[in-house]
Amino acid sequence: MGSIEEEARPLIEEGLILQEVKLYAEDGSVDFNGNPPLKEKTGNWKACPFILGNECCERLAYYGIAGNLITYLTTKLHQGNVSAATNVTTWQGTCYLTPLIGAVLADAYWGRYWTIACFSGIYFIGMSALTLSASVPALKPAECIGDFCPSATPAQYAMFFGGLYLIALGTGGIKPCVSSFGADQFDDTDSRERVRKASFFNWFYFSINIGALVSSSLLVWIQENRGWGLGFGIPTVFMGLAIASFFFGTPLYRFQKPGGSPITRISQVVVASFRKSSVKVPEDATLLYETQDKNSAIAGSRKIEHTDDCQYLDKAAVISEEESKSGDYSNSWRLCTVTQVEELKILIRMFPIWASGIIFSAVYAQMSTMFVQQGRAMNCKIGSFQLPPAALGTFDTASVIIWVPLYDRFIVPLARKFTGVDKGFTEIQRMGIGLFVSVLCMAAAAIVEIIRLHMANDLGLVESGAPVPISVLWQIPQYFILGAAEVFYFIGQLEFFYDQSPDAMRSLCSALALLTNALGNYLSSLILTLVTYFTTRNGQEGWISDNLNSGHLDYFFWLLAGLSLVNMAVYFFSAARYKQKKASS
């Protein structure tokens, strides 16, 4: 019999090995050199300031264009209210559609870091083109002469909209990757880092709104009082700073490896399950095909536990007699792993939750369209200062800046006592609260418009279309409520689509979340078009005419409030039936 020391030695060595392992992140990430990342030297909050700085400056650049774009279209390109609003929402929709391109490239081939780097360059080129279109005399549209406003030339349109849609492409490559790349800096297998990651999403959105605050206040004033060349040039400079901030943090980052095309994997499950449509799924789920390794067959992805819904798709993981005899399991178009099948199941389960974001985004789109037009029909003077209507977006941003720390420091600890959830509310609960608050926002906007129209009628301003002498500050409540809705819904959505998505589809799922913004903007454009069509028949003014005093913008806001209410009811029904993802430990 050996000594006590000899018997204890293996246990000591095992403990040292375990301690050494915990020095490194265990979520499959690597450092810049491709080695397992040391927790002490990489990721976590050490890397986040560079990512948050990048996001803050990039959002300042984006909102520096988007926040007051409708004013440029109406005053410089001489477009009507409906045409300008449609152009804005279509462009914003495209900005949230192009993330699908960046997401597929990031998840399948380049990884999030290099995708951000590449599309940042495209973004900067677009910003530069837009600045030139507002600065170079030959590229600027002619000014109005009295009531006559000459149309912009085809070359001027091409330069302006070319730059605008290069920005849409550039931001599309960045959007689905930055929040996920930031969350990648926290090890999912470490309980402490998981809590920090939940906090990261709050401060990520906080950074977005710091950039938006500068844009919606200072930049809007510069654009309308010091010229659009300077007003577009400053955001271009900040886009350059965003790129610099991102690259400075490179040595500190943790990187997740691309896992191959998610679209191919989804297609393989569909094809394999169809090919085995006559095969019976065994009652014992352990008989379904899965690799024996700790990690899944998908690069950079943990295994996902089997679930009993969508059982038809399980046929793709049934090992046929032919495959069992040959021992050849390599053809993924005939046989898929349980993890691969579960990836598709997760996307299917997410769909009803995902769809709720479309109506919410249609409501959010009003901040840069109809809220601005409503403000232009009000008294924008504060003392001797002329306040640009788009600058009211500052109150939405201020609301977010107030609500984020309030939520993170006070609401979460309080909610934790009642819900038992470490982060206060689950992502689904948080999003549901945001949907309810969005209904209140549209109701507030409608009430302000009712008051404005009554005053216009009492003062005889209906025919002239002159701004009504009611302070634009009456709009503050609707902006402030919208900011609160954002903190609950958009941040909850960010976290939901990161946590619930398969490991190798996180950029794609972030892009799908952003796609709701695109569809929401397109839906807003569609609703505007339909409302205009149906309310202007028989020679009527319509709800949204160029003279808002003779229209009924309040009806439009009530319509959106009603749609939001229905959307909320459908969401709660779907959320009650949602099954959470379970990754194998």
Curated annotation (Swiss-Prot):
Transmembrane regions: 91-111, 116-136, 154-174, 200-220, 228-248, 351-371, 387-407, 431-451, 472-492, 511-531, 556-576
Source species of the chain: Arabidopsis thaliana (Mouse-ear cress)
Any one Gene Ontology molecular-function term assigned to this protein's record: dipeptide transmembrane transporter activity
Name by which UniProt lists this protein: Protein NRT1/ PTR FAMILY 8.3
GO annotations of cellular component type: Golgi apparatus; plant-type vacuole; plant-type vacuole membrane; vacuolar membrane; vacuole
UniProt activity-regulation remark: Inhibited by leucyl-ethionine.
GO terms under biological process: dipeptide transport; peptide transport; protein transport; tripeptide transport
Function of the protein: Peptide transporter. Mediates the transport of di- and tripeptides. High affinity, low capacity transporter. Can also transport histidine.
Keywords: Acetylation, Membrane, Peptide transport, Phosphoprotein, Protein transport, Transmembrane, Transmembrane helix, Transport, Vacuole
SUPFAM superfamilies in the cross-refs: MFS general substrate transporter (SSF103473)
Membership in a protein family: Belongs to the major facilitator superfamily. Proton-dependent oligopeptide transporter (POT/PTR) (TC 2.A.17) family.
Main subcellular location: membrane
Domain of life of the organism encoding this protein: Eukaryota
Gene that specifies this protein: NPF8.3
Tissue note: Highly expressed in young leaves, roots and germinating seeds, intermediately in stems, flowers and mature leaves and at low level in siliques.
InterPro entries for the chain: MFS_trans_sf (IPR036259), POT_fam (IPR000109), PTR2_symporter_CS (IPR018456)
Cellular localization per UniProt: Vacuole membrane
Membrane topology type: Multi-pass membrane protein
Sequence positions bearing N-acetylglycine: G2
Phosphothreonine: modified positions: T115
Classification of source organism: Eukaryota, Viridiplantae, Streptophyta, Embryophyta, Tracheophyta
